[in-house]
Regions:
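Small-residue packing motifs within transmembrane alpha-helices
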Residues: 16, 20, 68, 75-78, ...
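Membrane-helix interface and helix-disruption motif detector
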Residues: 29-40, 61-63, 369, 427, ...
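Hydrophobic alpha-helical transmembrane segments in multi-pass membrane proteins
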Residues: 24, 190, 252, 257-430, ...
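Alpha-helical transmembrane segments of polytopic membrane proteins
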Residues: 37-47, 373-374, 434-439, 498-500
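Membrane-interface helix/helix-cap signal primarily in integral membrane proteins
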Residues: 2-7, 64, 73-271
Length: 528
């Protein structure tokens, strides 16, 4: 309890609340099917609080710890109820027979035999009337002469099929495909061979207007991304380089080949392909650098930071609203709002608040691999930076190198157990890989923006394109050299119990190192 009290009254109280909320969601997921009624949960909560009060009173604990315990239990209960309500929501009642459906394409991926489209439905035909429906489904279309044409986001489809709920399909590592579809807002699956038709551009636009406001914004942003991706076709680079650039800058990984994914996985640099705080932070830093003269005027601070918030969310929509990018978008939004008032805010509190907001909207997000890896890595970095400052308080030369190595090692250690559990691999030379990938990513993000902005200047765009192609070649050659090193990737298959033990050990090591750093700080205080 003293640790809880110190955490709550310390500098990161929101982190304490977020952990309590997460524990409630995890408990609800584990035992929610046994306890799923509010009339059971609330008395259970009151009973636990009563036992906690007796325990504190018996041990002679401070009275000020009781509110901390009550707040903790309250957020555990809120997390428990949030997940229970989410899990008990009824599934969509799909018609039992085939119907004529219409909707807009959201995204497209390909397999050897089919094209798999995520379709945002608008309506289906029931007799002589149209029944409105706003759900997303995966539509698998058998490849043929008509399906060979390229689908684009926003295109309207008319198809005759029966939609079913996703079938449970669990991989050996515990990945549940049906739950993954549900977490991504997909409520059904269907297959058509030839009974489908793509509507005209005019019909697609009319159908798009019948979508919800959020879906319209998403489809508009994806259409804009498609136009930007077409400009990458002018690059003097091979298809693999263009695929990497599309993933690094616009979050489009639909064209990524298994060999490219394997290369980045073996070198421990897969995180640069998933848009996150690294990419968004570079864009915000560049924007702040350009807007720095305006920040000298107090009246312009609010418009500048509000413009930054608008840019953050435009970029998030443009790149597909991935979990890791949503986390960083919320954190940078909070940072901008604090800066409007002349305050910096605490990064750990911003991280925790971002987690709470995302989990309130969708509690099942807690079990998403991207959510877990993103939050764990950032939590480890933010928790470890004070220790680095304590160990090297006055080092200025080479500080960037020290910070870079520290962040790479800490993020890799924090996510290694989960990466090994989900992907059964561990990259040995991740530091070498990141030393190549991150500087190249900075250059690619900067020059890709110049490339896209110079679309009206063909000569300038060609010069920038050559620079991009050169950086892509350096990135590919460097990572390929790291991947060819002996034992570059180890195959591991830990159990979930082993993963829990690893994190217990990591937490204990963190506590010991933090106490050591605190003692070093006290030792530096002069005595008079």
């Amino acid at each position: 309890m003293p640790l809880l009290y110190k955490a709550f009254h310390g500098g990161s109280p929101v982190l304490f609340l977020a952990i309590s909320f997460i524990l409630g969601i995890a408990a609800s997921s584990a035992i929610g099917h046994f306890v799923s009624q509010l009339w059971v949960e609330i008395p259970l909560f009151l009973f636990i609080v009563f036992l906690l009060w007796l325990l504190l009173r018996r041990k002679g604990a401070s009275v000020s710890m009781l509110p901390v315990a009550l707040v903790s239990m309250l957020f555990v209960l809120l997390g428990f109820i949030a997940y229970a309500l989410h899990a008990s929501a009824p599934d969509v009642a799909w018609p039992k027979s085939k119907k004529l459906w219409c909707g807009n394409i959201v995204s497209v991926s390909e397999t050897k035999a089919t094209k798999r489209c995520v379709v945002a439905l608008v309506a289906y035909k029931e007799g002589d009337r149209l029944v409105r429906v706003r759900q997303q489904v995966t539509l698998s279309i058998l490849k043929g002469s008509e399906a060979s044409a390229r689908f684009r986001p926003g295109d309207a489809l008319l198809f005759y099929a029966r939609i079913d709920h996703p079938r449970p399909y669990v991989l050996p590592n515990g990945f549940d495909y049906a739950k993954w579809l549900k977490r991504n807002g997909i409520a059904g699956t269907c297959f058509v061979a030839n009974r489908w038709m793509r509507l005209s551009a005019e019909s697609s636009e009319k159908l798009l207007q019948r979508q919800s406001l959020l879906m319209r914004c998403r489809l508009r942003s994806l259409q804009l991304r498609e136009k930007l991706l077409e400009q990458y076709g002018r690059l003097p680079a091979d298809s693999a380089g263009r695929q990497v650039l599309a993933a690094l800058t616009l979050g489009d990984k639909s064209g990524m080949t298994p060999s490219i994914r394997e290369l980045y996985a073996r070198t421990g640099t897969s995180h640069v392909l998933a848009l996150s705080g690294l990419h968004l932070g570079m864009l915000i830093s560049l924007l702040m650098l350009l807007m720095r003269p305006l920040l000298c005027f107090k009246r312009l601070r609010l418009p500048v930071f509000l413009s930054a918030v608008a840019l953050i969310w435009c970029f998030a929509f443009l790149t597909g609203l991935s979990i890791s990018l949503l986390r960083s978008a919320v954190m940078y939004t909070l940072w901008c709002l604090f800066m409007c008032r002349g305050r910096h805010g605490r990064s750990l509190n911003n991280l925790a608040l971002a987690a709470i907001l995302l989990l309130i909207v969708h509690p099942d997000t807690l079990f998403d691999v991207g959510f877990q890896l993103s939050f764990l890595s950032v939590l480890a970095i933010l928790s470890g930076m004070p220790m680095l400052n304590a160990l090297f308080p006055s080092v200025r030369k080479g500080r960037i190198v020290i910070d870079f190595l520290f962040i790479s090692v800490v993020a890799q250690l924090a996510t290694a157990p989960l990466v090994a559990y989900y992907f059964n691999s561990y990259s040995v030379y991740f530091i070498l890989g990141n030393c190549i990938a991150i500087p190249c990513t900075c250059l690619l993000l900067t020059f890709s923006m110049l490339f896209l902005m110079c679309s009206g200047l063909p000569f300038v765009q060609e010069l920038v394109g050559r620079v991009l192609a050169c950086v892509l070649d350096v990135l590919h050659v460097g990572l390929s050299a790291v991947a060819r090193l002996p034992f570059s990737s180890l195959w591991v298959s830990p159990s979930w119990q082993s993963v829990c033990v690893c994190y217990v050990v990591l937490v204990l090591l963190y506590v010991l190192l933090r106490r050591k750093c605190e003692s070093m700080l006290w030792a530096r205080v002069p005595c008079y």
